[in-house]
Amino acid sequence: RMPLWFGQTQDYVAALRNGDNTYTGEQFAGMSNGMNATEIGLPENGVRRHSVCLGLQAYPDWNSQTTPSEDVLNITVTLPLKIMTYGEVCLLKAEAALLGWNGAGDTGENYKEGIKASLADERSFLSDASLSPSTNDETYMTTGKVAWNDNDTKEQKLEKIGTQKWLALYPNGIEAWAECRRTGYPKLSPVLHSEDANINPANHEFIRKLRYTDDERRENSENATSSSL
């Protein structure tokens, strides 16, 4: 999914364009965990060395390397907002089946169908389907940590389902955060720095609630402002 969602670093594309075979930087790179606001704003930590959310869905020319240019950050694209997808439904059914709910079907089949549907859904936004062929989908679903194994423990199965559901929810960060809070999966790296004084990275603390509306804070102040909820 990475080429669909994220842009290659500008340094990587520049090296390709210039025929630089000595480039050793990352093709896709995220911002390093632990940077403060000042460090994030430094030129050496900018988009030249880090990916932005402009993959094949938003700016196909950049990741397909057909006409890479320096105006990558000025692109404007309108994509539909996903409320609930078939892939998410399948993965919810996989979890329900694993927990013994009636009528949820087979856990493993729901899991595999959810991944397949999620990948197809992401490609549906492409202007040219050939930019992201499904050639390697089966390998992705049947190897490594993604592969379904009936002999795994219940917790291992829950982790696989939760991780794939988290991926399927992108870019709905709020729901993905809520699912991670609910299930405990995927296992995310602890925050190493926080600009919020209420979050202590030393204790592996993370965001526990989102900001409530003013009406909620006024009418339900005790619960809306409680640090324990």
Name these PLM-found stretches.
Residues 3-229:
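Acidic/polar-rich alpha-helix caps and helix-coil junctions
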